[in-house]
UniProtKB/Swiss-Prot annotation:
Recorded name of the encoding gene: prtT
Signal peptide range in chain numbering: none
Single GO molecular function: zinc ion binding
Name under which the protein is recorded: Transcriptional activator of proteases prtT
GO cellular component terms given for this protein: nucleus
Amino acid sequence: MTRTTTLEEVKFEIPTWDNNNHIEVADGSGRSESNASGDTIRPKGRIRRSMTACNTCRKLKTRCDLDPRGHACRRCLSLRIECKLPDTAERFQDNASMWSDATAAIPSIEERLNSLERSMTEMTSMMRQMVDRSPSISGSSVSLLTRSGLTEETASVEGSQPSFIAPRPIRLIQELQSDFLGEPNVLPAESRSLSESFSNGVLDPKLSLKLIQLFVEHFGSWVSIDSPSDIHNDLRPTDPLLYRTACLLASRYVPGIPSSVIQAEYLQIRHAAVNILWNSQPMKYETLQALTLLSLWPTTIQKEAPMDSWLLSGISINHAIISFDFLNHAPAELIVDNDMVAKLRLWNALCLTQLQFAIGNARPFHIQQRYLEHCPRLLEHPAATFDDGKMVAEIQLYLVTSKLQNDPHRMRSAEIEYEEIERWKMEWAHLLTGEQHSTLELNLWYCQLLLYRTAMKCQWESEPLVSEVLRNARLIISKFLLVRFSTALGFVDQTYYIVGYAALNLCDFNPMDPLIDQVQTFLLHLSPNEDHIAYRFSYTISELKRRCTACPNPNSAVKGAFGDARKLNLGQLHFMPQVLDTMMGDYSALEQLMPEVSPHSLPDMLNNVTGELQAGYRTAIL
């Protein structure tokens, strides 16, 4: 079948590029034929594009876009090559018509690159600041002790921000005790005042007089109490809170007192102290003595949560600044007399306690330098004692430790010997060998241990740091085992934290070290009851060692509180090696409570710390 199409039925409409040119259909094939040449029907823009392109774009047959801000095309600018544009009068006018105002506002590629470089520099600086302010924990296995204290705060000097890498030994030990022994009891909500019933106390009067004598003998030097008459005069206490606090501290030397009586005494004292802190100013000197004693021994009873010594000493320091007039003068303006000696001794004890618990809990230290300058003035008086010098030396030691811990550069350098510590040793060398039972060396080794553990957060695999941690931990425990029981019972709570932290480090790195069992047994024999700090430290060390030895991978250990069924009592000594003799059942004589520790309990290789180390327990934080 054939279809015929006439010319009139098929018409093509082709747009004309020029009004003077006409396009017609030549035949029925559908092809058009122009009466002008091919050049006349091309768009004008295509002709001008070839004339305005630079030499490089023309050779490469690429689009040549002229940068409105310069005399070069964008391709040549991005490649940073010379751009040769033809000299035409229409070039700039044509480019201005092609680019809109929005296009002209776009910066060049080079400027955008410069902006990106500046942004990357700022971002890198911000990332470094974030790293400096956050704990850096390596991807290696973290031990049981590490997981117990991952959140960090730390001590600082004069209100500076806490260091991001400082350990928290006191907080760590308290968390481990809550884990192993259960959470402490919640204190009753009711409060008590210093009424007549509080003044009389819950102890028998004759027993109270005996306790006051024991207090003067073992604790009085801390707060300038040399005679029972300083506390109890004319059959009446000079200050009820001081009197009751003295009896409470001395009760550890008389283990026959029922624990329920001691607990009731402790709760009344605690409530009274809270009420007194909000009394009108200025505060009595005797009351400040009692608050200082409670700051030094905050964990007398462990059934309830211990008093926060950092907070208690801080508030007491504020009261002392108001009550002690000499603190508002320059140190050289006043002469140190007998009255000022007693107040300076109290002031130094508060400052030292604030420093120790600020570092131990990784909290700020806010005492201004002008107040700290009064501390050494106590040594100017002829009545200054060895303990006074030791206290001033410890204040200087903890200040140096706090400054070093808050210097990230020094901690990252992982130094083995610190110049500031060495200068301190030279300055106080006469006190380091002054008395056999002095705790000054314990504090020195403890501060060094903290610095090494802080540095290990940046270089946790450093063998020299591990060796120094073990060496200082062994020195602390070995020195402590040489102390008489009667002397150890009078140690402030900070000393027990030092010994406990050293034992935990040994458990963390080398749980088979024999010193662990020896110090655990020593603490258990030392504790007069299960509520004493020594007993709880002994059990914490025992339980942590058991977990470290039984669990090859610390991360697989399950954290949880254990009930009373897992707790030990003083009659169950079968879980420990026979290092010391069995405790005596008759406590009628106080001397029977204070046996000597034989020298053979110390290890022969005191300085040999290159023994077998378990890599799984080399932690970044303790």
